[in-house]
Amino acid sequence: MAAGKAASKPSLWQNERVRFAVCFCGVFVCYFYYGILQETITRADYTHAGKKEKFRYATTLVFIQCIINAAFARLLIQFFEGSKQDHTRSWLYGLCSLSYLGAMVSSNSALQYVNYPTQVLGKSCKPIPVMILGVTILRKKYPMAKYLCVFLIVGGVALFLYKPNKGSSTSDEHVFGFGEMLLLLSLTLDGLTGVVQDHMRGRFQTGANHMMLNVNMWSTLVLGIAVLWSGEVWEFLAFTDRYPSIIYNILLFGITSALGQTFIFMTVVYFGPLTCSIVTTTRKFFTILGSVLLFGNVISHMQWFGTILVFLGLGLDAKFGKSPKKTTH
């Protein structure tokens, strides 16, 4: 009798709160270090023979990242899932990978024009396109509290990104505007990615590791063609030959990305893309603090007020925001 009760007792992993806590902590730890490595690679000055240069190979960086992500997902499937079948349509993985890598390349490229805290707060808008496209395409319905929380996030991000006109038109202002456009493109593609992922989990019950593997394999294929066609990969190899110390940071960057993506796709499968986008946003405040402390990026009082609004909205969402009432896949 006692043995029967013990056998029927659910495992700790079946507890939704435990599962969510593991996903959140995994995302937080992995992407905190990921963000530091990203800024170290893309914003550092590299000096060779008295000449300074910047890292300008965002596409190749994402290409390497996708290879490591796919390899890691394959290992997870091999050791933990065995012969479990995946019935998801291949074209859905292809569409998801195109929007996913487009968002990533745009976001990484934006770092060449804006500092990391600006990029992070800009990407904090991610729940907005995920919600909008979910409502318009998948016919999701959210409670009013959810929309209020999103409004607070939008207002906070707008305050953070706003810069008063100092009365002169400089190239810096133009460059900042281009960075904003890259962030906007990245957010739109994030929303499309969320819609496709929601459809896959609802229609095909796609597993986290299979989603991670196939999305990254498609991304590797597309990016491999892109970097070979443009010749960027050869310029990247020449750059690493001049600065071999960067290879260590790139490998660490790829490993932290793979670990972080494991928790990201677990969150998508178990809790949905909107919850995942909110999780990835809440950890950004600590990423910003880390960037400010380590790299000396200055944040104004208005930007701090915007930051407070962003995370006030996220806090209210955690307390009052409910799951969508209806989803049509």
Swiss-Prot record:
Q: Which GO terms describe its biological process?
A: UDP-galactose transmembrane transport
Q: Name one Pfam family in it.
A: UAA
Main location per UniProt?
endoplasmic reticulum
Motif Di-lysine motif located where?
Answer: 325-329
Where's it found, cell-wise? Answer: Endoplasmic reticulum membrane
Q: Which InterPro entries match?
A: SCL35B1-4/HUT1 (IPR013657)
Offer a single GO CC term for the protein: Golgi membrane
Q: Does the keyword Aminoacyl-tRNA synthetase apply?
A: no
The chain's coiled-coil residues are none
Query: What are the alphabetically sorted keywords of the record?
Result: Endoplasmic reticulum, Membrane, Sugar transport, Transmembrane, Transmembrane helix, Transport
Membrane topology, as annotated, equals:
Multi-pass membrane protein
Where is the chain membrane-spanning? Answer: 21-41, 60-80, 91-111, 142-162, 175-195, 220-240, 250-270, 292-312
Q: Name one GO molecular function term.
A: UDP-glucose transmembrane transporter activity
What is its biological role? Probable sugar transporter.
Q: Which PANTHER family match?
A: SOLUTE CARRIER FAMILY 35 MEMBER B (PTHR10778), SOLUTE CARRIER FAMILY 35 MEMBER B1 (PTHR10778:SF10)
What information about domains appears in the record's comments? Answer: The di-lysine motif confers endoplasmic reticulum localization for type I membrane proteins.
To which protein family does this belong? Answer: Belongs to the nucleotide-sugar transporter family. SLC35B subfamily.
Give the protein name, as stated in the record: Solute carrier family 35 member B1
Q: Taxonomy-wise, where does this protein's organism fall, top ranks first?
A: Eukaryota, Metazoa, Chordata, Craniata, Vertebrata
